[in-house]
Amino acid sequence: MPLIDASAKIHPTALIEEGAKIGANVEIGAFCVIGKDVRIGAGTKIHSHVVIQGDTEIGEDNQIFQFASIGEINQDLKYQGEPTKTIIGHRNRIRESVTIHRGTVQGGGVTRVGNDNLFMINCHIAHDCSIGNRCIIANNGTLAGHVTLDDFVIVGGMSAIHQFVVVGSHVMLGGGSMVSQDVPPYIMAQGNHAQPFGVNLEGLKRRGFEKATMHAIRNVYKLIYRSGKTLEEAIPEIEQYAKTEAAVSLFLDFFKRSTRGIIR
């Protein structure tokens, strides 16, 4: 029998497979399917017609809307049914028809979503993606396998991000963007292929960044994109900014992780 907390509300048409664990005050709507290796944390609400499969852990106070599919077999042709996972944090809003696929052994075995994210209608999050906290992916946004979104990333509607791309914190990607290289933190980018269009100042203001910090970030942006210097030449100057403005260190950490080169 599934382990269902007494306070959970399960619609009689929902199918909860033996072995599933359902936490306190969880709501599961009509015609949902919850697989045997699924764990759902307290306070999460799952609307009708949602399918959750595989070794999937969902945290507390999430909302998952109609026709979403989470933890299903991924679309990597190399996948042979190996045991892999999907892990989702707390307070996420996963809207209608979103798909989040389980990981692959080649990619570390886990597709991971943090806390307080919003995935709008028809988004796709492929195998082995890692999404931080407070990200927004607008309608029909697509993340290919192994993509990393750091914190506070906004992906505009109809955008697609190539395999293995890393998108830094506080990035704003405009709608319809095709992203094939890594996107440094704090910047705005748009296009096919995506190009940088300045610093995401409005987003930084909303998150309480000080004027001096934003000024330093703008100076680093100019070093990277307008000075004519190579990235290797710019890094020593960026390191100097990081000594007085801790937020600038995100650039340095990002460059260490970047494997695809940055957008230009």
UniProtKB/Swiss-Prot annotation:
Gene3D superfamilies (alphabetical): Hexapeptide repeat proteins (2.160.10.10), Udp N-acetylglucosamine O-acyltransferase, C-terminal domain (1.20.1180.10)
Signal peptide positions on this chain: none
Catalytic activity: a (3R)-hydroxyacyl-[ACP] + UDP-N-acetyl-alpha-D-glucosamine = a UDP-3-O-[(3R)-3-hydroxyacyl]-N-acetyl-alpha-D-glucosamine + holo-[ACP]
A Pfam family it matches: Hexapep
Known EC number: 2.3.1.129
Chief localisation class: cytoplasm
Pathway annotation: Glycolipid biosynthesis; lipid IV(A) biosynthesis; lipid IV(A) from (3R)-3-hydroxytetradecanoyl-[acyl-carrier-protein] and UDP-N-acetyl-alpha-D-glucosamine: step 1/6
InterPro entries: Acetyltransf_C (IPR029098), Acetyltransf_C_sf (IPR037157), Hexapep (IPR001451), Hexapep_transf_CS (IPR018357), Lipid_A_LpxA (IPR010137), Trimer_LpxA-like_sf (IPR011004)
GO CC, one annotated term: membrane
Molecular function, one GO term: acyl-[acyl-carrier-protein]-UDP-N-acetylglucosamine O-acyltransferase activity
BP terms from Gene Ontology: lipid A biosynthetic process
Keyword Lipid metabolism: yes
UniProt enzyme class: transferase
Subcellular location: Cytoplasm
Keywords: Acyltransferase, Cytoplasm, Lipid A biosynthesis, Lipid biosynthesis, Lipid metabolism, Repeat, Transferase
Self-association state and partner proteins as the record states: Homotrimer.
NCBIfam families: lipid_A_lpxA, PRK05289.1
Function: Involved in the biosynthesis of lipid A, a phosphorylated glycolipid that anchors the lipopolysaccharide to the outer membrane of the cell.
Family classification: Belongs to the transferase hexapeptide repeat family. LpxA subfamily.
Protein name as catalogued: Acyl-[acyl-carrier-protein]--UDP-N-acetylglucosamine O-acyltransferase
Origin species: Glaesserella parasuis serovar 5 (strain SH0165) (Haemophilus parasuis)
